[in-house]
Amino acid sequence: MLVPGRRPQALPSLCFCILVLACVVACQQEVPAATPSMPPELVDSPWSLMKDKVKTLVTRTREKWQWFWGPEAFQGFVQAYYEDHLKDLRLRTQAWLRSSRDSLLNKAHSLCPQLLCRDGDKN
């Protein structure tokens, strides 16, 4: 089957994308909404203690990194980036344009035959 207006090479990629999308939708429908509870035989096992420790670790890590996701951290990053890279951009750009122009004029003058370009024609 060819899709009108599409190349035949794109068809396998399209089929793969549709297959992946169908699998994702099917998997989402099979997952129950409630979180399953632990079986009674595992409640007193070392695995339940591990679950509590992991939950505590995740909570502490989330609290410690909360500053990173706040607006102050992003504003500080943007300010530091501006000061390090963009503050003197206008001056650097002007200097680069001047040096590029001078270099280009020098190259053009060196390629010019002596009969056509005299010393008075440099400007």
Curated annotation (Swiss-Prot):
<dbReference type="GO" id="GO:0034364">
    <property type="term" value="C:high-density lipoprotein particle"/>
</dbReference>
<comment type="similarity">
    <text>Belongs to the apolipoprotein C4 family.</text>
</comment>
<dbReference type="Pfam" id="PF15119">
    <property type="entry name" value="APOC4"/>
</dbReference>
<dbReference type="GO" id="GO:0034361">
    <property type="term" value="C:very-low-density lipoprotein particle"/>
</dbReference>
<dbReference type="GO" id="GO:0006869">
    <property type="term" value="P:lipid transport"/>
</dbReference>
<keyword id="KW-0813">Transport</keyword>
<keyword id="KW-0964">Secreted</keyword>
<dbReference type="GO" id="GO:0070328">
    <property type="term" value="P:triglyceride homeostasis"/>
</dbReference>
<dbReference type="GO" id="GO:0010890">
    <property type="term" value="P:positive regulation of triglyceride storage"/>
</dbReference>
<keyword id="KW-0445">Lipid transport</keyword>
<dbReference type="InterPro" id="IPR028120">
    <property type="entry name" value="APOC4"/>
</dbReference>
<protein>
    <recommendedName>
        <fullName>Apolipoprotein C-IV</fullName>
    </recommendedName>
</protein>
<feature type="signal peptide">
    <location>
        <begin position="1"/>
        <end position="27"/>
    </location>
</feature>
<keyword id="KW-0732">Signal</keyword>
<comment type="function">
    <text>May participate in lipoprotein metabolism.</text>
</comment>
